[in-house]
Regions:
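NTP-dependent small-molecule kinase module
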Residues: 39-41, 63-64, 104-107, 126-168
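ATP-dependent NMP and nucleoside kinases share a basic, alpha-helical "lid"
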Residues: 56-110
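Phosphate-binding/switch loop-helix module in NTP-utilizing enzymes
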Residues: 33-68, 76, 164-167
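Short, charged, surface-exposed secondary-structure boundary motifs
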Residues: 30, 98-101, 154-155
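Amphipathic alpha-helical transducer elements in NTP-driven molecular machines
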Residues: 23-31, 82, 92, 111, ...
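N-terminal phosphate/diphosphate-binding loop that engages ATP/GTP or pyrophosphate donors
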Residues: 1-40
């Protein structure tokens, strides 16, 4: 995960981080590592500790492949990153679905309480979605509505297959 390392900041301050703003991301590192993967070089991807609100000491070794899948709500927000992508997919979900998924994930996997998740959603997640995420919809090659579009899935699959065929 490419959230910035915040180990030099007190935990109470880290808890206030707006993770839905592009400044929370270490985009330069992501771009560098994606370029290395595309050049056939392995990379050590950082691992983020959501309970401590900072990067952990662990890394995940990622080997280069013919197809590299990159996902994240802010992936299309940076032009330099968009320019490195062969196909750009925007997955659309309505606001109710987004908040329900977030509550379930953050309570189950990140040790958060529901009240805190709802407050964060209303104060940062929702406004940042409309400011930084939704405007990137028009930059996508394909828009998929929460997995309910088999034609879009077929287009993505066929595009990936074409990339694989050309790589051989």
């Amino acid at each position: 995960n490419y959230y910035r390392d915040q180990s030099d900041i007190p935990l109470e301050e880290r808890r206030k981080t707006n993770y839905d703003h592009p400044d929370a991301m270490e985009t330069e590192l992501l771009i560098r590592q994606l370029m290395n993967l595309k050049a056939g070089k392995a990379v050590d991807c950082p691992v983020y500790d959501y309970t401590q609100h900072t990067r952990s000491d662990q890394v995940v070794r990622v080997e280069p492949k013919k197809v590299i899948l990159l996902e994240g709500i802010l992936v299309l927000a940076d032009e330099r990153l968009r320019d490195l992508l062969d196909i750009k997919v925007y997955v659309e979900a309505d606001a109710d679905e987004r908040i329900l998924r977030r509550i379930i994930r953050d309570v189950k996997e990140r040790g958060r309480d529901m009240e805190g998740v709802v407050e964060q959603y209303l104060t940062t997640v929702k406004p940042m979605h409309y400011l930084y995420v939704e405007p990137t919809r028009c930059m996508a090659d394909i828009v998929i509505n929460s997995g309910k579009n088999p034609v879009a899935f077929t287009l993505v699959k066929n595009t990936i297959q074409k990339i694989l065929d050309e790589a051989e």
